[in-house]
Amino acid sequence: MDSHSIDLLEELVIASKLLAAAVLGAVVGYDRERHSRDAGLRTYASVCVGAALFTSIAGHLEDVSATSRIVANVVMGIGFLGAGIVYKDSNSGYAKGLTTAATIWCTAAIGVAVGLNMFVIAIAGALLAYFLISLHHRKWYVRWKHRIKQPRNVD
């Protein structure tokens, strides 16, 4: 066996990380899937798995600094994906896709955390991201958002 190969047990550990990343990414994408958004469960799970895979592979390279370079490139790649998602709505003049881009970026970070064996951080990140995505369906949040956007009378 050459120095670049890993044994079957290590490959199974990486495979279990990928499964964990898929589940966590799916958790983040669930609310979007439920409300028929373009980027949903499959997109978020795929981003999380990809980030975990790149990071896990980097952990087995001989060059220790390769991990940080690969993580940086994952962030950059997701940035390009996010840039393609954000657009300006010609009717309203508002930017669209910002939340999608931000949560896809966050989901990549969750995948990186899984790839680096930071499972508690990954789970906390996934749950927090899901909560933030689902806020716009909460009545209290909608009322609060509407209230703060109302102009105040200044006498």
Task: Please provide the spans of the model-predicted regions.
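Membrane-helix boundary connector in multi-pass membrane proteins
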Residues: G93-Y94, A108-A122
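Alpha-helical transmembrane segments and their membrane-interface boundaries
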Residues: M1-I70, L116-N117, A122-A124, S134-Y141, ...
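Generic transmembrane alpha-helix signature in multi-pass membrane proteins
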Residues: T55-A58, G82-Y87, C106-G115
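Short, amphipathic, aromatic/basic-enriched membrane-interface segments that mark the entry/exit
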Residues: S36-T43, K88-T99
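Alpha-helical transmembrane-segment detector that highlights a single hydrophobic TM helix
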Residues: V64-N91
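Hydrophobic, membrane-inserted alpha-helices
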Residues: G25-V28, T103-G111
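Alpha-helical transmembrane segments and their membrane-interface exit regions
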Residues: G77-A83, L128-R138
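Short hydrophobic alpha-helical membrane-embedded segments
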Residues: T43-C48, V74, K96-W105
